[in-house]
């Protein structure tokens, strides 16, 4: 590429990556802020729908009110429909009443006439009988006197006797006829007919009276009135007015009748009350709903603004954490005691930047906060590395930006909706009473409208009905009882005339006699009092005989207030909502409409949250698979394989060298491992079955909560599968001739390479590639047998194609000023053993360990972590070592350094801006490129040959600090202490120290390919998948104070803050 070969033509202040100001300018696009904005927009949509619902509620309320007006009009028109049905009944009742009144009046008059006739006839009969008694008694007295006289006067009395007897016979006949006539009209029974026997006047035959006396008696007999004449006259006088009244009654009632068709019917009256409808409660509820929604939107916007500010701080904090991580990485790579060097002190450190290392670095840089949280959780919960890896993967998985966006949208949306739904209850309670009052007032309005309409109709109807009643009443009074004025007076006159006739008759009979006064008094006492009573009765009839028909009240067609309220309450409830059903009235419907829209939005946010839940379930499934499922499947496959193969054949497969005192590992047992002698049995490459388990790589040395590890009692290593490199399937014929030549110089044969190639021809399947990463840790691992970086970098076999990158953090000038001759006298250190395996770094980042002298009196390790900017003294149990200086600097290479570029940048030949620079002053020797580079070249061997092979197997190495960690801080060599390695900058180097050393940090193994040609070669096994971030919590870092920093050096402005925060 051109930018690798040519320097830039123009100077620019921009970089290819975003710096802090650029990141701060994008803080408003964070997922939480976008989630809040999304929720605010959804709430705004709900607010618009609520406003539409309010308008719709008012429209529906008016429409309901119109319908209520129609219903109220129908209710108010009840008098019309009541009158239509009532008029016929009223007419029938009036007509029946008239017919009954006529019959009653006629019957009454008939009975009255009979009673009057009876009374009059009774008095008449008594009078006539008494009169006859008096007359006949007087005549009998006279006859007796005459007989006495006739006895004297025989001649006179004989004639008188005959005449008297004849008169008595006539009297008997007349009396009999009279009594018979009375019996014919007497309803109380027959009156016996008295018989007057003629007196015996034989003695008067000889007596005769004078003629004048006899003529006077005959004349008296002729003057007595007859009974039949009086009777006929009384009947004519009494019966005539009654007959007239009866005829008038019949004629009057025949002309009077009530017809339902002629009765009035009220008109339908329309009720109107919607113009007086109070809609303020709807407006108040709507305003409160809109107000609450707007408050929610404003709160969301305020929270969004606050989150923007907090996100700026958070972005600054992440930038600071990233800078701290970069400082960790830079100083970790520089101070790693296992860093591979090129045979000289000034050689460039080489690290293995595999895909795994870069992916871990990228993940940590992408999620620094998640990484920090997981590290702290692991430290506090004292989780195992496997559990820590799973937890960090799980958090990175479920908080992947799209998944985190779903989570935030769902949580913020549901939280806001639930808050609004909870606020609906107080809102309903607030306006429920007001709505009830409004409904009550509306009911009263409807009731008053109905009452007013019904009162008007009832008044008109009653007036018309009463007019008809007055007409009928006048007709009856004038036509039926008009005879009173014309008959009462004549009847009274008739009775008076009857009384006068009786008195005249008595006067005629007894006038001039001694009985006149007695008879007159008797008639007055017997008949006069009764006549007076009859006159009074007729006068009462004249004054009171009138028909008063009942009138119709003005409120006859009105309903009672209870009935009107009962009729108007459902109408008001239908219009306003009564709250007795599911809609909870007007307020309930209005609030429920908005609540329903919120519930629909809740479904949307619930879907977002469910999507994040699906991601969580997927992550849990993946964790379950890699922690339980896959190991079980691999175990089943291995058991099936072992069962199918039975006893493994001997020969062909070489087991790495192992000390005889340690028990065989599981890999050696499964593959026919050797005995205590060290070299195991071999198996031919042709006999290797497919999916043969390979020796597991060294597990991660990351232990954020490091405890001194206790070795397994059995000393048996656990099986962990090795993940193949991306170049695992490169064919063996692609090995270059140069590599073959280098193998020959190393004393290796092609057979060993072929054996290694055949051993890796059948890599484990995809299912078992990551078993070593997620496998369960049963106990502390024993030393694994894995091809070291030195062998892989020298042989470049098919399983290793990891690039070698030189990372330089020090300039040449700084190295000369800082390091000086710190390693110049390293060859003079006594007791140095090139075969003694050096300690494995806590950082475990570089592909190969760097050989250093452990007889130095004082070694200082660098680390970015600091506490209060003070140097920490070396303590027991912690090891320190100086950094490895780089080979050259930008100044030495001739590249002009920009003032804004730190001295650590552009100091490597791998840098694109150094591609066109001339060859450095001190190029790397060619020999390390051809011959295998020793793993520990910091101190030369005693015979000054760093590449010689030992003729015998090495002694078992036991690191002194494993048993006694304080040995590193003591001067074990007795020689003068060499100067500590200092950083390339002008300020004192920061000090880092391993605070929790463990025995598993120093694991030795022999490469399988070198056992045949190199029976004694001790290599340090390392895990190529470890990054400096894995051991972050195992190192304490002390940075120098700010006052000691060189002013000309570009300084990270967040270094102190990062150190304090971290």
Curated annotation (Swiss-Prot):
<dbReference type="GO" id="GO:0043332">
    <property type="term" value="C:mating projection tip"/>
</dbReference>
<feature type="topological domain" description="Cytoplasmic">
    <location>
        <begin position="42"/>
        <end position="102"/>
    </location>
</feature>
<dbReference type="GO" id="GO:0005886">
    <property type="term" value="C:plasma membrane"/>
</dbReference>
<feature type="glycosylation site" description="N-linked (GlcNAc...) asparagine">
    <location>
        <position position="221"/>
    </location>
</feature>
<feature type="topological domain" description="Extracellular">
    <location>
        <begin position="1"/>
        <end position="20"/>
    </location>
</feature>
<feature type="transmembrane region" description="Helical">
    <location>
        <begin position="21"/>
        <end position="41"/>
    </location>
</feature>
<feature type="region of interest" description="Disordered">
    <location>
        <begin position="830"/>
        <end position="850"/>
    </location>
</feature>
<comment type="similarity">
    <text>Belongs to the PRM1 family.</text>
</comment>
<feature type="topological domain" description="Cytoplasmic">
    <location>
        <begin position="626"/>
        <end position="1062"/>
    </location>
</feature>
<feature type="topological domain" description="Cytoplasmic">
    <location>
        <begin position="316"/>
        <end position="396"/>
    </location>
</feature>
<feature type="transmembrane region" description="Helical">
    <location>
        <begin position="103"/>
        <end position="123"/>
    </location>
</feature>
<feature type="topological domain" description="Extracellular">
    <location>
        <begin position="420"/>
        <end position="604"/>
    </location>
</feature>
<feature type="glycosylation site" description="N-linked (GlcNAc...) asparagine">
    <location>
        <position position="250"/>
    </location>
</feature>
<feature type="glycosylation site" description="N-linked (GlcNAc...) asparagine">
    <location>
        <position position="456"/>
    </location>
</feature>
<feature type="transmembrane region" description="Helical">
    <location>
        <begin position="397"/>
        <end position="419"/>
    </location>
</feature>
<feature type="compositionally biased region" description="Polar residues">
    <location>
        <begin position="841"/>
        <end position="850"/>
    </location>
</feature>
<feature type="transmembrane region" description="Helical">
    <location>
        <begin position="605"/>
        <end position="625"/>
    </location>
</feature>
<feature type="transmembrane region" description="Helical">
    <location>
        <begin position="295"/>
        <end position="315"/>
    </location>
</feature>
<feature type="glycosylation site" description="N-linked (GlcNAc...) asparagine">
    <location>
        <position position="553"/>
    </location>
</feature>
<keyword id="KW-1133">Transmembrane helix</keyword>
<comment type="function">
    <text>Involved in cell fusion during mating by stabilizing the plasma membrane fusion event.</text>
</comment>
<dbReference type="InterPro" id="IPR026777">
    <property type="entry name" value="PRM1"/>
</dbReference>
<feature type="glycosylation site" description="N-linked (GlcNAc...) asparagine">
    <location>
        <position position="451"/>
    </location>
</feature>
<keyword id="KW-0812">Transmembrane</keyword>
<keyword id="KW-0184">Conjugation</keyword>
<feature type="region of interest" description="Disordered">
    <location>
        <begin position="960"/>
        <end position="991"/>
    </location>
</feature>
<feature type="glycosylation site" description="N-linked (GlcNAc...) asparagine">
    <location>
        <position position="206"/>
    </location>
</feature>
<keyword id="KW-0472">Membrane</keyword>
<feature type="topological domain" description="Extracellular">
    <location>
        <begin position="124"/>
        <end position="294"/>
    </location>
</feature>
<feature type="region of interest" description="Disordered">
    <location>
        <begin position="652"/>
        <end position="675"/>
    </location>
</feature>
<keyword id="KW-0325">Glycoprotein</keyword>
<keyword id="KW-1003">Cell membrane</keyword>
<feature type="glycosylation site" description="N-linked (GlcNAc...) asparagine">
    <location>
        <position position="492"/>
    </location>
</feature>
<dbReference type="GO" id="GO:0032220">
    <property type="term" value="P:plasma membrane fusion involved in cytogamy"/>
</dbReference>
<protein>
    <recommendedName>
        <fullName>Plasma membrane fusion protein PRM1</fullName>
    </recommendedName>
</protein>
């Amino acid at each position: 590429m051109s930018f690798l070969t040519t320097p830039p033509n123009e100077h620019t202040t921009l970089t290819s990556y975003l710096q802090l100001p650029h990141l701060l300018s994008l803080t408003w696009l964070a997922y939480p802020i976008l989630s809040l904005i999304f929720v605010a927009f959804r709430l705004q949509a709900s607010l618009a729908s609520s406003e539409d619902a309010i308008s719709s509620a008012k429209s529906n309320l008016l429409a309901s009110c119109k319908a209520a007006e129609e219903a109220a009009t129908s209710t108010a028109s009840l008098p019309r429909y009541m009158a239509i049905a009532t008029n016929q009944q009223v007419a029938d009742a009036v007509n029946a009443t008239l017919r009954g009144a006529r019959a009653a009046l006629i019957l009454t008059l008939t009975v009255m006439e009979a009673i009057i006739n009876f009374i009059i006839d009774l008095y008449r009969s008594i009078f006539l009988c008494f009169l006859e008694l008096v007359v006949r008694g007087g005549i009998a007295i006279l006859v007796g006197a005459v007989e006495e006289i006739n006895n004297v006067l025989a001649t006179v009395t004989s004639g008188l006797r005959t005449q008297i007897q004849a008169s008595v016979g006539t009297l008997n006949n007349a009396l009999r006829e009279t009594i018979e006539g009375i019996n014919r009209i007497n309803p109380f029974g027959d009156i016996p007919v008295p018989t007057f026997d003629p007196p015996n006047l034989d003695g008067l035959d000889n007596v005769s009276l004078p003629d004048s006396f006899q003529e006077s008696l005959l004349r008296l007999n002729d003057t007595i009135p007859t009974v039949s004449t009086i009777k006929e006259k009384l009947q004519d006088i009494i019966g005539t007015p009654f007959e007239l009244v009866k005829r008038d009654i019949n004629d009057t009632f025949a002309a009077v009748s009530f017809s339902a068709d002629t009765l009035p019917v009220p008109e339908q009256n329309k009720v109107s009350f919607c113009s007086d409808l109070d809609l303020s409660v709807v407006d108040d509820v709507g305003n409160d709903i809109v107000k609450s929604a707007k408050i929610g939107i404003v709160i969301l916007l305020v929270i969004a603004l606050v989150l923007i500010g907090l996100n700026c701080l958070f972005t600054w904090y992440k930038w600071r954490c990233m800078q701290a991580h970069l400082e960790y990485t830079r100083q970790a790579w520089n101070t790693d005691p296992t860093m591979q060097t090129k045979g000289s002190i000034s050689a460039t450190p080489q690290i293995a930047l595999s895909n795994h290392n870069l992916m871990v670095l990228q993940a940590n840089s992408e999620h620094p906060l998640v990484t920090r949280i997981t590290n702290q959780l692991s430290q506090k919960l004292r989780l195992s590395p496997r559990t820590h890896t799973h937890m960090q993967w799980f958090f990175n998985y479920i908080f992947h930006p799209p998944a985190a966006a779903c989570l935030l949208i769902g949580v913020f949306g549901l939280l806001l909706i639930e808050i609004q739904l909870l606020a609906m209850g107080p809102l309903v309670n607030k306006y429920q009473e007001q709505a009830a009052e409004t409904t009550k007032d509306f009911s009263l309005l409807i009731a008053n409208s109905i009452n007013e309409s019904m009162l008007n109709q009832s008044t008109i109807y009653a007036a018309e009905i009463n007019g008809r009643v007055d007409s009928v009443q006048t007709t009856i009074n004038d036509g039926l009882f008009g005879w009173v004025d014309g008959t009462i007076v004549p009847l009274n006159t008739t009775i008076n005339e009857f009384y006068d006739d009786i008195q005249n008759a008595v006067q005629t009979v007894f006038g001039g006699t001694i009985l006149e006064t007695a008879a007159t008094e008797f008639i007055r006492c017997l008949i006069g009092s009764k006549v007076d009573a009859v006159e009074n009765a007729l006068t009462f009839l004249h004054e009171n005989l009138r028909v008063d028909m009942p009138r119709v009240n003005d409120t006859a067609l009105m309903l009672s207030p209870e009935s009107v309220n009962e009729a108007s309450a459902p109408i008001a409830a239908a219009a306003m909502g009564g709250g007795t059903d599911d809609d909870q009235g007007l307020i309930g419907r209005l609030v429920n409409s908005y609540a329903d829209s919120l519930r629909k939005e809740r479904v949307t946010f619930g879907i977002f949250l469910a999507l994040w839940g699906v991601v969580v379930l997927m992550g849990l499934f993946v964790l379950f698979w890699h922690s339980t499922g896959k190991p079980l499947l691999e175990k089943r496959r291995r058991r099936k394989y072992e069962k199918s193969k039975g006893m493994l054949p001997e020969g062909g497969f070489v087991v790495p060298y192992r000390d005889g005192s340690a028990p065989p590992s599981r890999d050696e047992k499964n593959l026919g491992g050797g005995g205590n002698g060290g070299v195991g049995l071999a198996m031919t490459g042709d006999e290797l079955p497919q999916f043969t388990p390979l020796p597991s790589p060294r597990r991660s040395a990351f232990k954020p909560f490091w405890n001194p590890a206790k070795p397994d009692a059995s000393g048996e290593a656990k099986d962990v599968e090795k993940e193949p490199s991306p170049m695992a399937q490169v064919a063996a014929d692609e090995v270059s001739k140069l590599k073959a030549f280098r193998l020959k110089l190393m004393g290796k044969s092609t057979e060993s390479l072929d054996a290694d190639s055949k051993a890796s021809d059948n890599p484990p399947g995809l299912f078992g590639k990551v078993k070593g990463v997620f496998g369960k840790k049963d106990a502390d691992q024993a030393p694994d047998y894995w091809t070291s970086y030195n062998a892989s970098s020298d042989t470049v076999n098919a399983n290793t194609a990891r690039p070698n990158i030189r990372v330089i953090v020090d300039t040449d000038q700084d190295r000369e000023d800082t390091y000086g001759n710190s390693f110049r006298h390293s060859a003079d250190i006594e007791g140095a053993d090139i075969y003694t395996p050096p300690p494995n770094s806590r950082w475990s980042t570089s592909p190969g360990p760097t050989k250093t002298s452990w007889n130095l009196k004082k070694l200082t390790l660098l680390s970015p972590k600091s506490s209060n900017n003070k140097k920490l003294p070396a303590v027991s149990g912690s090891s320190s070592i100086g950094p490895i200086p780089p080979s050259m600097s930008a100044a030495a290479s001739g590249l002009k350094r920009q003032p804004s570029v730190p001295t650590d940048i552009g100091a490597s030949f791998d840098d694109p801006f150094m591609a066109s620079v001339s060859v450095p002053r001190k190029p790397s020797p060619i020999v390390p490129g051809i011959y295998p580079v020793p793993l520990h070249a910091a101190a030369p061997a005693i015979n000054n040959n760093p590449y010689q092979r030992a003729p015998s197997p090495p002694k078992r190495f036991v690191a002194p600090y494993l048993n006694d960690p304080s040995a590193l801080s003591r001067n074990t060599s007795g020689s003068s202490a060499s100067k500590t390695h200092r950083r390339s900058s002008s300020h004192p180097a920061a000090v880092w120290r391993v605070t929790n050393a463990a025995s598993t940090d120093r694991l030795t193994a022999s490469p399988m390919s070198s056992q045949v040609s190199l029976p004694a070669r001790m290599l340090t096994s390392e895990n190529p998948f470890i990054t400096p971030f894995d051991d972050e919590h195992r190192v304490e870092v002390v940075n120098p104070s700010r006052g000691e920093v060189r002013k000309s050096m570009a300084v990270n402005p967040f270094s102190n803050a990062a150190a304090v925060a971290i």
